Amino acid sequence: ANKRPIWIMGHMVNAIYQIDEFVNLGANSIETDVS
């Protein structure tokens, strides 16, 4: 079988406290906006 990874991204995580929120919602990757 050709297995591929599935990414559930937490989009626009802009504060440390949001990481736990997105992970608790099922995210297994985090995307941040840095400026």
UniProtKB/Swiss-Prot annotation:
GO terms for molecular function: lyase activity; metal ion binding; phosphoric diester hydrolase activity; toxin activity. Binds 1 Mg(2+) ion per subunit. The keyword Lyase applies. Its EC number is 4.6.1.-. InterPro entries: PLC-like_Pdiesterase_TIM-brl (IPR017946). It comes from the Eukaryota. This is Dermonecrotic toxin LdSicTox-alpha-1. It comes from Loxosceles deserta (Desert recluse spider).
